[in-house]
């Protein structure tokens, strides 16, 4: 097969590309330039997709012995990921930009261009597995190394996208093994640290970054009864489940800490309450997709496990499609669910699909 290897400049994508070559594929490496911000256009800058990352990717491609290109996807990234991130926070939601990048850039824009150029598949360094069932359908599964499993952030992929995707690291038992393999191959990125920041906010100051773009308008902090108990300097800076940074000048009557329960951008208010009020009995979202054949017909409940964060434990649940939404009821309450988060549903290790959470029903009445 002709394979386009997406090379971020890190160790995972470099080893994935090398394994694709070893498997006998005709491989071409490509690095995606996703930002034109001055802070990313010099060596030593943090985040991903910097000039230094591009240089690391090129060195890896040279060692592996494959052609290498840099493609400018910065405009598409700004529109589909950065602008979406700003819009979601402005609406009082908590988005996951990595999932949006996978959905709109790596497995949409990049894959579309790859197919147009005659490639058969896109290869990445994600830790996930693709399994072909008895009927020849490709299924997305968790990686062998659950500690590094990234199937959650790939939950947005459709069956058509999975048909043209390769994840060579899915069967690798540990990241240490990947680093050892990179060193044995002579790849200089073998000891390169992982990137954990949002790539377009490399200093990690999400609150300050949003304030520059959304603005910071003083508003009220309310308790669950609607009583004003404090003020904030911009509702966009808060997310459901947050405890730190609340400007409340006196303790709650029972002395227990308060947590953000809701962000209301329309009236610029933040609602807080006790930790148990974060327990959620049901979540639902209208923007859902399946990673293959839907597990059940509409209005028919099906058993699954639901995961609402990249490294959260899956929780047994019952889900169904009803009223144009994917509705999920966990067997035990979920904690700290924010609108805008993604709920990925599994059957064992297999990813069934996902939805962006629009609403969350509290398990604790007001």
From Swiss-Prot:
Superkingdom of origin = Bacteria
NCBIfam families on file: PRK00143.1, trmU
Q: Which organism is it from?
A: Leifsonia xyli subsp. xyli (strain CTCB07)
Annotated GO biological process:
tRNA wobble position uridine thiolation
GO cellular component terms, alphabetically, are: cytoplasm
Its function, per the record, reads:
Catalyzes the 2-thiolation of uridine at the wobble position (U34) of tRNA, leading to the formation of s(2)U34.
Q: Which residues bind ATP?
A: 6-13, 32, 125
One GO MF term, please?
A: tRNA-uridine 2-sulfurtransferase activity
| InterPro entries reported in the protein's UniProt record | MnmA-like, MnmA-like_C, MnmA-like_central, MnmA-like_central_sf, Rossmann-like_a/b/a_fold
The cross-references to CDD domains, in alphabetical order and at most eight, read:
MnmA_TRMU-like
Which cysteine pairs are joined by S-S bonds? 101-199
This chain belongs to which protein, by name? tRNA-specific 2-thiouridylase MnmA
The answer, when asked if RNA-binding is one of the entry's keywords, is: yes
Site (Interaction with tRNA) location in chain: 126, 341
What is the taxonomic lineage of the source species? Answer: Bacteria, Bacillati, Actinomycetota, Actinomycetes, Micrococcales
Listed A to Z, the keywords are: ATP-binding, Cytoplasm, Disulfide bond, Nucleotide-binding, RNA-binding, Transferase, tRNA processing, tRNA-binding
Family according to the record? Belongs to the MnmA/TRMU family.
Principal location listed in the UniProt entry? cytoplasm
- Which E.C. number(s) belong to this protein? 2.8.1.13
Catalysed reactions, semicolon-separated = S-sulfanyl-L-cysteinyl-[protein] + uridine(34) in tRNA + AH2 + ATP = 2-thiouridine(34) in tRNA + L-cysteinyl-[protein] + A + AMP + diphosphate + H(+)
Residues in the active site? 101, 199
Segments carrying the region annotation (Interaction with tRNA) are: 148-150
| Annotated localization | Cytoplasm
């Amino acid at each position: 097969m002709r394979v386009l290897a997406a090379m971020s400049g890190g160790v995972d994508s470099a080893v994935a590309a090398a394994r694709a070559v070893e498997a006998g594929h005709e491989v071409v490496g490509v690095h995606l330039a996703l930002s034109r911000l001055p802070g990313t256009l010099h060596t030593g800058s943090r985040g991903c997709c910097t000039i230094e990352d591009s240089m690391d990717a090129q060195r890896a491609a040279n060692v592996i012995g494959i052609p290498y290109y840099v493609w400018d996807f910065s405009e598409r990234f700004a529109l589909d990921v950065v602008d979406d991130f700003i819009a979601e926070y402005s609406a009082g939601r908590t988005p996951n930009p990595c999932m949006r990048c996978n959905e709109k850039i790596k497995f949409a824009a990049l894959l579309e261009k790859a197919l147009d150029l005659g490639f058969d598949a896109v290869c990445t360094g994600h830790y996930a597995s693709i399994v072909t069932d008895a009927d020849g359908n490709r299924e997305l599964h968790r990686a062998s190394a659950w500690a590094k499993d990234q199937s959650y952030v790939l939950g947005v992929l459709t069956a058509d996208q999975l048909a043209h995707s390769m994840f060579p690291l899915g069967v690798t038992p540990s990241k240490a093994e990947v680093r050892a393999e990179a060193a044995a191959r002579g790849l200089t990125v073998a000891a390169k640290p992982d990137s954990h920041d949002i790539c377009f906010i490399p200093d990690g100051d999400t609150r300050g970054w949003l304030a520059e773009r959304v603005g910071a308008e003083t508003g009220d902090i309310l308790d669950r009864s609607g009583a004003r108990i404090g003020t904030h300097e911009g509702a966009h800076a808060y997310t459901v489940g947050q405890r730190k940074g609340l400007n409340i000048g006196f303790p709650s009557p029972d002395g227990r800490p308060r947590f953000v329960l809701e962000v209301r951008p329309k009236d610029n208010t933040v609602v807080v309450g006790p930790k148990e009020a974060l327990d959620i009995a049901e979540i639902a979202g209208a923007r859902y997709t399946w990673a293959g054949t839907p597990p059940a017909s509409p209005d028919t409940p099906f058993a699954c496990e639901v995961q609402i964060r990249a490294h959260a434990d899956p929780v047994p649940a019952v889900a169904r499609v009803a009223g144009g939404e994917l509705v999920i009821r966990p067997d035990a309450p979920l904690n700290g669910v924010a609108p805008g988060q993604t709920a990925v549903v599994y059957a064992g290790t297999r990813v069934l699909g996902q939805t962006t959470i629009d609403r969350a029903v509290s398990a604790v009445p007001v």
